[in-house]
Amino acid sequence: MNFQSVIATLNQFWSDRGCLIAQSYDTEKGAGTMNPHTFLRAIGPEPWSVAYVEPCRRPTDGRYGENPNRFQHYYQYQVLMKPSPNNIQDLYLDSLRALGIRPEDHDIRFVEDNWESPTLGAWGVGWEVWLDGMEITQFTYFQQCGSIDCRPVSIEITYGLERLAMYLQEVDAITKIAWTDNITYGDVYLQGEIEQCSYNFEASSPDFLFNLFGLYEQEAKQLIKRELVLPSLDYVLKCSHSFNLLDARGVISVTERTRYIGRIRNLARQVGQLYLQQREKLNFPLLKETMEAA
């Protein structure tokens, strides 16, 4: 099963189980959780079921394409269901069956691993899912998002698409993954991975990035004052990515790191609160629609 087929199979599987199949969000981010389809929709009482592919950038993870299992740019397949279905583990195992992985034929373990995103003020309890000794998925029951208690609790399922594809195709490097039957992952991304690593670790200008962070933070604050939820979130995400680039460049001390994370978390909290207030003013329309449908 090539990489495209893995995505198509998961899209069909979760669509058949009531999920909106959304698209990735068009700004740099370190995780699929940062997409407003998850970060914002996990807040408040309204039900929400969504699935989507999210390209992620984690500058510090880059290894110039030389590490077979580690890139600074990669893909997550994200599922969020609110409220969490009682049979969510069974649904997940069925999704593996749809990919041709029979759980009864493999060593599948749910290993306790609570998750946290300090910059988003988000955390939850959950597990890593290990398939024959390799982590392929993260399960998280959200307790907070934007430092706001999640009621009801959402379940987030994050598949590592590259790891899944490597397992299914029995290859030992990301670059060897068949994206289609005649194009590899390396054909598509290896050169870009090398160049982005050169930028992240060598060519980026720390002064420029520090200035960018300050400008993005200033813009986020004035947008929050104007009560513009999504534009505000855009600039919070830009702050986060600028910080990650500075971190990769090695120019932020331990003390500064904590302070920068706190500044981003404070902005994320304000955006989350603003979103909740906005939905409340609208009388939580999706909650009403669900009650009428029932």
From Swiss-Prot:
Q: Where in the cell is it found?
A: Cytoplasm
Cellular component per GO?
cytosol
Query: Highest taxon of the source?
Result: Bacteria
What InterPro entries is this protein classified in?
Answer: aa-tRNA-synth_II/BPL/LPL, Gly-tRNA-synth_heterodimer, Gly-tRNA_ligase_asu
Q: What class of enzyme is it?
A: ligase
Cite a single GO MF annotation: ATP binding
One Pfam family this sequence matches: tRNA-synt_2e
What's its catalytic activity? tRNA(Gly) + glycine + ATP = glycyl-tRNA(Gly) + AMP + diphosphate
Quote the Gene3D superfamilies the UniProt record gives: Bira Bifunctional Protein, Domain 2, Class II aaRS and biotin synthetases, domain 2
The protein depicted here goes by the name: Glycine--tRNA ligase alpha subunit
Which organism encodes this protein? Trichodesmium erythraeum (strain IMS101)
